[in-house]
């Protein structure tokens, strides 16, 4: 036993051993990512460097970092060597962009398979597939609204970093993308919502296919997400952000208050969202 252990130590101390161990960690345990855009502001910030747990939702089929070349075949056909439970509602998730698997996104899982989503001006609604009794038992009554005889939950997640930008009318931009055939949600009229001038509809609707996930950025009006390009299949799920190991602001100063913080801490404690709001930012009208 001691002899085998010594051989392992010798191997791990070699260049080959170091590379193999690092790749195994990246393939199966954790991988580093950098937040490149403001779509999750004020929860995750541009310049946050994260470690992502690769085993949060099963074990993904390993790929060479940056090149995204598969090391092994996709034996199960669902992008995972070992299946696991998929993302829960409200989870922050790292996944591959469905239209380009070399691009990674990080968003919040707004809805799971079978759920219904309504998006209108400055508000979003969720109908969990479990139905009315589940909604009444799991959400505060003041958030529950009824559309066409079905209960929905208005803004079901209370994380302090979730925000809308009063300077931006994303609904108008959604119309542009809809007319260009680049918007995934369907226009609908919802009687209980305010009418929008000159339009035959006042909201957008989407029902999430089974075993897929509807991903939305916390920075609602600056997020290119499932509202535009549809839901995310389980095969594209990479993992769950774990903790911030480094963070730089726009002036290349280290955000010491974020370094070493677990994502669960950052997303749940209001002081982190407030400090993020206190930073100087200029989103303009970008959708990222």
Task: Place the predicted regions along the sequence by residue.
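Hydrophobic membrane-insertion alpha-helices, especially the h-region
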Residues: 10-30
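Soluble "head" domains of membrane/secretory-pathway proteins
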Residues: 2-9, 28, 45-288
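Alpha-helical transmembrane signal-anchor/signal-peptide segments
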Residues: 31-48
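Short linear Ser/Thr-Pro motifs
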Residues: 14, 37-39, 223
